[in-house]
């Protein structure tokens, strides 16, 4: 619980920074039922709890009330490291084409969560934040072609992300 509280405090303090970027580009429309399921984290600018993550997977399930039950699991520091699990809840922000959510780690606060990019076949996505402090490149499979990865990195660079902070997340299944 301490680490969850610290992560929340970090996200809140990060939200206090002044914004000097243009608005973050988001996916035009997200079909929520199609977006649900498992997403492997290919790379990220990690939060403090994700540093050293291996086999990171974010799983989404649409609840009957319209909220999104989220499970984030990974192994700490190695493929055989301690299994870590976090269960934030997502809330779609109306008028965003389902591309912007508030992600609640601790009630009543919600963190910014934006689906910046989603390919047509729903196999690759980028989740970002307006502050450009954290980002997640995710896919339906544990790996993607290097050329595809470089295209996603270029997209992040065009959105004013500091891509030098981007870290590949080891996946071995």
Name each model feature, range by range:
Residues 16-173:
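A beta-rich soluble binding module of mature secreted/lumenal proteins
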């Amino acid at each position: 619980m301490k680490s969850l509280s610290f992560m929340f405090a970090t996200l809140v303090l990060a939200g206090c920074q002044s914004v000097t970027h243009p608005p973050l580009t988001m996916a035009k429309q997200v079909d929520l039922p199609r977006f649900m399921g498992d997403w492997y984290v290919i790379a990220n600018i990690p939060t403090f709890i994700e540093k050293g993550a291996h086999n990171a997977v974010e799983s989404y399930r649409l609840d009957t009330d319209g909220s999104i039950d989220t499970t984030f699991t990974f192994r700490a520091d190695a493929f055989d490291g301690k299994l870590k699990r976090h269960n934030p809840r997502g809330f779609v922000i109306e008028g965003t084409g389902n591309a912007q959510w508030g992600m609640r780690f601790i009630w009543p606060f919600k963190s910014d969560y934006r689906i910046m990019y989603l390919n047509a076949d729903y196999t690759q996505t980028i989740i970002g934040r307006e502050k450009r402090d954290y980002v997640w490149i995710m896919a339906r499979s544990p790996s993607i072609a290097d050329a595809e990865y470089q295209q996603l990195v270029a997209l992040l660079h065009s959105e004013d992300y500091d891509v030098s902070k981007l870290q590949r997340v080891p996946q071995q299944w």
